């Protein structure tokens, strides 16, 4: 599998210790829900794509970590359910989140089950992913690099579109078309991420409410790009300051500073904040992030998106005391 290639040097040990991990039962329970689902009751899977997406995520994580065949079998069945229901342009491009949710449900099994898919299944997945890339890339080229911030694009769409190119870039029939698209999204990230391209202080200019929706991409993209390029994308000043920014603007077990849309909804730190702090602490040894993750430990385990990362990175420990020079 390519999508989590940055875990290649950790996953074997993690598999041996998986059942003793504190989050193992949550991982297995989520996958069990996908196994128990009655797929015959799903008439049009695209009308329930958010449910399908949740199943795909859970099964991908469970099979990748445990290698138990039952998870791969059900993941394959979900892909076949989608492939057996042709999706029209009207449905595929009804909205951009819908497009990338559908693409996600195709590219995950394609990545994990590639060797067991038939040539027809592979071709069908590739056709779907190319439909999405061919629709959005021309619209985004020349636009996204000149916009201040397109919420949906940076929250999810860039990540999924880049993943699609990462799976297809060496396909002989597609590489001439895919490589320039892949390069565009790579250059766009290096120029405008993680926070518009000019933010260095670790704050999220779009507001504390929207930060939740960006956390997974803010974790995933630098991890993948660092692995591919052998350059540390977490050296960006924004990442170096994000732990302290979280600590002072969204303290654990406390209200946030109230900046931006939906900030009023949260009376305590969210599991997304906690998961991001844990990630920063593991990868950068940031003292503020380590303290934050410890304080929000009970909230942290609710996060599903980064659970595979945490379980694969269990040997990476971090300090949990506030830095001695923390402003009082």
Predicted regions and their residues:
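Extended polysaccharide-engagement surfaces of secreted carbohydrate-active enzymes
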Residues: 206, 210-328
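Extended, small/polar residue-biased N-terminal targeting/export presequences
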Residues: 9, 13-19
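Aromatic-lined, polymer-binding surfaces characteristic
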Residues: 3-4, 15-17, 24-32, 36-250
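N-terminal carbohydrate-binding accessory modules
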Residues: 1-2, 6-9
């Amino acid at each position: 599998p390519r999508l989590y290639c940055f875990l290649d040097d950790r996953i074997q040990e993690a598999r041996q210790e998986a059942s003793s991990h504190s989050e193992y039962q949550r991982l297995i329970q989520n996958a069990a829900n996908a196994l128990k689902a009655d797929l015959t009751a799903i008439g049009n899977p695209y009308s329930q794509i958010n449910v399908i997406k949740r199943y795909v995520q859970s099964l991908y994580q469970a099979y990748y970590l445990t290698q138990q065949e039952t998870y791969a079998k059900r993941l394959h069945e979900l892909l076949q359910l989608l492939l057996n229901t042709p999706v029209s342009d009207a449905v595929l491009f009804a909205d951009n989140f819908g497009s990338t949710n559908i693409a996600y449900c195709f590219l995950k099994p394609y990545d994990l089950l590639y060797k067991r898919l038939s040539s027809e299944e592979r071709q069908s997945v590739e056709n779907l992913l190319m439909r999405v890339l061919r629709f959005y890339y021309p619209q985004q080229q020349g636009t996204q690099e000149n916009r201040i911030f397109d919420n949906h694009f940076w929250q999810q769409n860039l990540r999924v579109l880049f993943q699609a190119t990462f799976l297809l870039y060496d396909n002989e029939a597609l590489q001439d078309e895919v490589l320039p698209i892949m390069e565009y999204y790579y250059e766009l990230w290096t120029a405008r991420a993680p926070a518009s391209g000019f933010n260095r202080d670790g704050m999220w200019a779009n507001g504390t409410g929207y930060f939740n929706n960006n956390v997974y991409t803010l974790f995933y993209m630098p991890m993948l790009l660092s692995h591919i390029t052998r350059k540390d994308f977490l050296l960006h000043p924004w990442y170096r300051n994000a732990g302290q920014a979280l600590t002072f603007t969204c303290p654990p077990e406390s209200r946030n500073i109230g900046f931006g849309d939906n900030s009023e909804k949260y009376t305590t730190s969210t599991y997304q904040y906690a998961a991001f702090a844990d990630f920063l602490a593991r990868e950068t040894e940031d003292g503020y992030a380590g303290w934050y993750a410890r304080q929000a430990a009970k909230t942290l385990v609710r996060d599903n998106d980064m659970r595979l990362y945490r379980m694969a990175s269990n040997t990476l420990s971090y300090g949990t005391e506030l830095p001695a020079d923390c402003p009082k």
